[in-house]
Amino acid sequence: MPVPDSVRLAMPVEAVDIARLQRKAWSRQPGTAAALAAIPADQAVRTWHEAIVKPPLAHCRVLVALSQGQVAGFVVTGPSNDPDAEATDGMVAEFVTDADVLDDHASRLVNAAADTLRADGYETATWWVRSDDDALRGFLIECGWAADGAHRSLGTEDGTEAVKQVRLMTRIADRGPAPNAG
């Protein structure tokens, strides 16, 4: 019987698939070669396993998108660690989909991330996006996210590789019931 496509919390055994997808995504992105080379595949699997079974904070979650029963993407949510963050700000810390299924599973993952952050009590969600990732930024804008003016540059200590990012945000708080018009 076919398994319906869905998004759910990651299972420990899926750490291998998550690490594989992350490494595949990082290998396609300029500026991440040093990070990819510095982390052996088995260490990445152990790190993801730990994040699933013993997250660093109670509100840190790893969600997976399933396609025909296989992991096709993942998203990590948690409290925002930005210096200007409020206690009610959550964030999408990592978002990866298999390049072949972006359209199919990206919206499921984005919606599940927002739902998870909302359920954890956050009112606003933030997301750092590579400044040159027009496809992801455009997709998120279509989903209701907007740039908030913040930007940063991440890179290696020797300065040989740098990734410029812009921050997007969206309001996720429940707006409550509509006022009674009668």
PLM feature spans:
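Conserved beta-strand-loop-alpha-helix junction that forms the acyl-donor binding cleft
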Residues: 97, 127-137
